[in-house]
Design a protein with these regions (language model features):
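Rossmann-like NAD(P) dinucleotide-binding subdomain of oxidoreductase/dehydrogenase enzymes
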Residues: 1-123
Length: 123
C-alpha cells in the first residue's frame, strides 16, 4: 500500500494528485487527509469510488497526527507521499527506517511558503 498524507492548506488538489499518481502506478492507497479537512478528504475519496476505483484499492483514514504516525509504522508500505512540515517529514522518514525491512520511497514536499498578493482590483 502507498500512504498519501495531505495538508490542510491545499486539501483537494494535493490529495487528488497523490492518490491519482499512486493508483496509476498500480498501488493500493491509504489516504490520510489533515484532521482539519476530514470532510473534504472523505468527499475526494468518495468521488474516486463513484468513478469506479474499488473500495479495496483506496481506503480513507481520518484522524490527527497520531494516526499519521501509526500509519507510517506499517511494515508493508510501498511508499509515502507527504505534503507538510519538515519536522513531520523527518519523523515519517525515521518511522520508515525503523519499521521497514526494505527501502521505502518517501516523496516529501515541505516548506510550502506561499505568498498571496491582494490589491484594490479585487474589491
Amino acid at each position: 500500500r502507498f500512504l498519501c498524507i495531505s495538508p490542510w492548506n491545499f486539501p483537494v488538489a494535493i490529495l487528488i494528485g497523490q492518490i491519482s499518481a499512486a493508483l496509476s502506478c498500480g498501488n493500493k492507497v491509504i489516504a490520510k487527509p489533515s484532521e482539519h479537512t476530514s470532510i473534504l478528504g472523505y468527499l475526494v475519496v468518495r468521488k474516486f469510488h463513484e468513478c469506479g476505483v474499488p473500495l479495496s484499492a483506496l481506503e480513507l483514514i481520518l484522524g490527527d497526527g497520531l494516526y499519521g504516525d501509526m500509519l507510517t509504522k506499517i511494515n508493508s508500505l510501498q511508499g509515502v507521499a507527504f505534503t507538510g512540515s519538515l519536522p513531520t517529514a523527518k519523523k515519517i522518514q525515521s518511522n520508515l527506517i525503523e519499521n521497514q525491512n526494505q527501502i521505502v520511497p518517501l516523496i516529501a514536499e515541505t516548506g510550502g511558503i506561499n505568498s498571496m498578493l491582494v490589491d484594490s482590483v479585487h474589491y
